[in-house]
Amino acid sequence: MQRATGVLRILGSFSQRCSPSSSATPSRFQTMNSRRKRNSIRKAAAIEDLVEPRKVKHVTQAAAGMEEWIGSLNNAAIHMALDEFMRRPMVRQLAKENGINDKLFIRAFKSFREYCTPEDLSSVDPGLLILMSDISKGGKDCEMLYPFFLDHSKQVFPHLEAMDDLRIISDLTRPHNWYPEARSIIRKIFFHAGPTNSGKTYHALKRFGEAKSAVFCGPLKLLATEVFNRTNALGIPCDLVTGEERRFAKDNHHPSQHLSSTVEMLSTQMRVEVVVIDEIQMLRDEQRGWAWTRALLGAAADEIHLCGEPAAINIVKKLLEPIGETVEVRYYDRKSPLTIADRAIESYSNIEPGDCIVCFSKRAVFFNSKKLEENGIKPAVIYGDLPPGTKLAQAAKFNDPDDECNVLVATDAIGMGLNLNIRRVIFNSCTRQTELLPTYAALQIAGRAGRFGTAYANGVATTMRKEDLGTLKTILAEKVEPITNVGIAPTYDQIETFSFHLPQASFVRLLDLFVSVCSVSDHFFICTVYDMRELAVLIDQVPLPLKVRYTFCTSPLNTDDKRTAAVFVKMARRFATGQALTYEWLMDMLEWPPKPASTLSELSLLEQNYEVLDQYMWLSMRFPDMLPDEPRVRDASKILDKMIQDGVEGFMSLLAVGPGDNSDSREKRLSRPSEEKLAKSASEKPTRKSSILEALLKRTDISEEDLDQLREELNKKKKKP
């Protein structure tokens, strides 16, 4: 297996899901995928750009009788010797052999020259002065300065002393060796491969229930909770572990032999008979892929059952080759047909019961929900920021044939984790963040249409706008390229050992240096380090032990939200003082109790507060002594979940809808500029003469009426003291 050092992929890449086509002339979609692949690769900064030089102190007391040895040596003579030293090719060659490249050489030489030419030469190392004197008299060659230069360089850049050790510590090319418990077992690997709604997970879960001891690893806590509930309902005691909670079938003194968990919570030390790893294709995920790689290589079980897309089969086999494990593949076909409609929806009046409009932003969810309400259709709503309870409640309303909410508007969060009786999946757009949907993502979403054993067994996929339908058909017709790279992440032990050699480096600097010098093999890319670094920057000035800091920085927090990021920093600061993060302290910070949401901004505030409570519960699982009030905070989160449910129920009042628009304006807003124009306008920034609101109007579907309403809300906020 080839070893690739130096430049690494930090934030994952789309290379594993956007491989170039084997055909001579790639399609437009493959070309765009290749471009996305190139643009998504983040190169690690070179180590010489990361290290900070240290000041080398002069000797405080000169050796007696130095004048006799150095004679008439002065700074001018020293400068001449140093200039000649710097120009020697042999000196540069020796420097490179010791890890000092050209950029580091210039920085180290500048420091060395400053050290050698102070106003008072008596403060310089006597041995160096004697050599300088001999060189100036022609008795010695300037290349003999190299040992002094190298010693000085290692004082200026301490990492040079430990480069070999740092490279060994940060070697990520053999992750199989990180899991001795799994390597002590001759494991049987079964791959249940098939599309959505093929029954692949069902067959793996049958083996889960039959085993004497088993663990289910799901991608979401919603799915882990569903398996937990269903297993216990079948009379098989099963515990639940997610990042935020642990629940027992009986009690914590009597753990069950069956466990349902999120994939990150799998213990690689626990020996069981069966482990089921769902959605194995998530290996390619740029943020969480490391967890599936870890589960695949580290699960200590006699049988490993993998469920997922066929695109992951080859990479799974390659990952297991070095340890001599083979894979038995079992293929499953979709149980009910999925067809692509010949016509787009085009008008909200064509929406029917069982339809699901899939959007790729919360704003688009709000917009489409408003238009449906204006057409007399009350939709259920699901998007990523909603708490699990609210998502389940909205899913239940949509699935209930007697409920008036028989249409769903959702983000691509419905791609996994929720059982939904969808007849038609309607793509509101074929782009996500101005980029075309990759084929595997479009198939995952479209596959939610039609559910075996329900009234909507036959699924249909289409688009809202007719100009998108051809694009969707082309995307879905593309072959899903086999996954070629999977995520990997450094362990805490590696980071800790790394820090021993660089005791003065901050945690942010440690992460940067680790990524710069580490090695990964061709089948891996580094993920999570970028997200971890964002959190590390937030608490860089907070004095925390390394283990605590590392744990804080691995928490699943959305740093894009400034409020939750600010609360995260406050939690870290209080932790650093040794004060417990109590329920009273947390509630005071959140200005509890919250007010019911009467606007979208107030609903968003409730969602942010829920994320803060979620963060508290996540940390309390790891530091129960410092965050002692997890039960009370969990009760508060349930209250908040219910308030958010109520807010979503009163969706139209939150949208502050005015009089209905005429049908012509509605139809006009259904049309959208081409994907090329959309991508171009998204990159345009407002000029000084244009307002931010006008710029937003140009690059979104916001209507003039929506804009007036937005201005009105902003003016109200501005008038508040």
Swiss-Prot record:
Compositional bias per record (Basic and acidic residues), positions renumbered to this chain: 663-687
Q: Which PANTHER family match?
A: ATP-DEPENDENT RNA AND DNA HELICASE, ATP-DEPENDENT RNA HELICASE SUPV3L1, MITOCHONDRIAL-RELATED
Q: Does the keyword Hydrolase apply?
A: yes
Instruction: Define the transit peptide region by residue numbers.
Output: 1-29
User: Would I find Transcription regulation among this entry's keywords?
Assistant: no
Q: Which residues form the Helicase C-terminal domain?
A: 343-499
Q: What class of enzyme is it?
A: hydrolase
Q: Which residues form the signal peptide?
A: none
GO CC annotation, single = nucleus
Keyword entries, A-Z? ATP-binding, Coiled coil, Helicase, Hydrolase, Mitochondrion, Nucleotide-binding, Nucleus, Transit peptide
Organism expressing this protein natively: Caenorhabditis briggsae
Determine the domain of life of the protein's source.
Answer: Eukaryota
Q: What is its EC number?
A: 3.6.4.13
- Region (Disordered) residue ranges read 655-691
Supply one GO BP term: mitochondrial RNA 3'-end processing
Q: What's this protein's name?
A: ATP-dependent RNA helicase SUV3 homolog, mitochondrial
Where does the Helicase ATP-binding domain start and stop, copy by copy?
A: 181-319
What stretch or stretches form a coiled coil here? 692-720
Instruction: State the family it belongs to.
Output: Belongs to the helicase family.
